[in-house]
Amino acid sequence: MESIHTVRLKPGEEDRLLAGHPWIYRNELQGWPPSVEPGDLADVHDSRGHFLGRGYINPRSAIVIRLLARDRASIDLDFFIHRIREAQAWRERMVDDLRTRPPQARQDAPLPRAAYRVVHAEADGLPGLIVDRYGEAVAIQILTAGMERRRELILQALEEVLRPQAVVARNDSPMREREGLSREHSVVRGELPPSLTVPINGLAVTIDLLEGQKTGLFLDQVDNYRLLERVADGAEALDCFCYTGLWGLHAARYGAARVTGIDQSVPAIEGATALAKRNGLADRCTFRVGNVFDELKERDRRREAFDLVILDPPAFVKTRARLQEALAGYKEINLRAMRLLRPKGFLVTCSCSYHLNAETFRRLLWDAARDVRRAVRVVVQSAQGRDHPILLGMPESEYLKCFVLQVL
């Protein structure tokens, strides 16, 4: 049986944990035994000796402990099976289209959703673990030493609960290096088919689980893509930072007359072009390699106009120290996008930077609107989908902001 260390918090440092946050920083602990190895289990007590929870410890990390349980649960195979089964049950209950298509449905009826997040780390009680499902394949990200130590238990639990044909480890996040782990990606169970295609909101989307961004595509935006259904019909649309084109392809599916997508990645643009052809949308979708900042500036100079502009950039704010610099970048692209919109046109604008909260992002959008002297109406304010749940006591779990605005 695995030995479990005991650690104590400094006086007054328990409030965040009692409010539901699962992290403990090194400056909040009185110390830890010298025998501690990265990934060991530890029971956490407050300064008076009251038990608070059980987690794994890594003295090499700024986040020294991540709680797995608020009781003295055994962190064994049954623990992981239970947590993953609970997470899957949550998705089946809360995500609209995970239900199987009924036998009496027409054969051209939409297929049930096959791509979704099964485990969203801390929000599902499994800090440091991401599990995404793509049809019969599963992609995992193990981000911490504590979860890396339990990799085999995790894989066994996934086989028990999800029974995938293949499991791909996408352990290429820089977060692993901060935990003292190397980066790697490989097929760790089963055999991955040479081509994997899943239905996304009625589109057939080919996934590259080994080389694609994140674990294959941006699952946190799948629900938000549907927001275009009310604003894309008949539009001339510009999809910026388009990656493999899913925003633009959804716009075309929902009736956009013409879509132009821009991304600086050649493989992404090749993928977007292929998806447009596969879905019969190539006649209305054009994707090109380009720098979005330069493209927006040049199109503004030429006084081009669009009915719909989509901004879904990568995270500009990697650390709090870079926030002000990143805010300038966010403001520039949103300001130029507003200038490109015809009266009553729509702007879909997103940020996946945790350090840029929703209130600050909204104020930034207001500043941009004021600078271009345009009145702007908020149509929808959204976040990540329900398969990416948010812990109320953990602000870090709420990272995606998505606004649909109408520029009057």
Which functions belong to the PLM regions below?
Residues V119-L126, I130-D132, E148-F218, R226:
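Non-catalytic substrate-recognition/targeting regions of SAM-dependent transferases
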Residues G234-Y243:
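Conserved class I S-adenosyl-L-methionine
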